[in-house]
């Protein structure tokens, strides 16, 4: 019974410490984004640029000329 109580206390202590540290680091990250926004804007700009490149890559209306050339070589195309 004593071991069971100890394990419950350890579990709740671990839960409280992890929860508080998550809140603490979240607050630090928010503060850092407000103080130094230029570091985080650059990263977002790169992601937007990469997303735009992917949208152009998978654009359904963009013709794949190499595929068309290969398909024209088939007799039924």
Curated annotation (Swiss-Prot):
Q: Which UniProt keywords apply?
A: Cleavage on pair of basic residues, Membrane, Secreted, Signal, Target cell membrane, Target membrane
- The answer on whether this UniProt entry bears the keyword NADP reads no
Q: In which tissues does this protein get expressed?
A: Expressed by the venom gland.
GO cellular component terms given for this protein: extracellular region; membrane; other organism cell membrane
Location relative to the cell = Secreted; Target cell membrane
Propeptide residues are 42-77
Its signal peptide is 1-23
| Origin: domain of life | Eukaryota
Report the domain remarks: Amphipathic and cationic peptide with an alpha-helical structure.
Its biological purpose: Antimicrobial peptide with potent activity against bacteria. Acts by fastly disrupting the bacterial membrane. Shows activity against Gram-positive bacteria S.aureus (MIC=1.5-3.0 uM) and S.epidermidis (MIC=1.5 uM), M.luteus (MIC>48.3 uM), B.thuringiensis (MIC=1.5 uM), B.subtilis (MIC=3 uM) and Gram-negative bacteria E.coli (MIC=12.1 and >48.3 uM) and P.aeruginosa (MIC=12.1 uM), as well as against penicillin (MIC=1.5 uM) and methicillin (MIC=3.0 uM) resistant bacteria. Antibiotic activity is not affected by major negatively charged components of the prokaryotic cell wall (e.g.
Family membership: Belongs to the non-disulfide-bridged peptide (NDBP) superfamily. Medium-length antimicrobial peptide (group 3) family.
Question: What's the protein called, per UniProt?
Answer: Antimicrobial peptide megicin-18
- Record the organism: Mesobuthus gibbosus
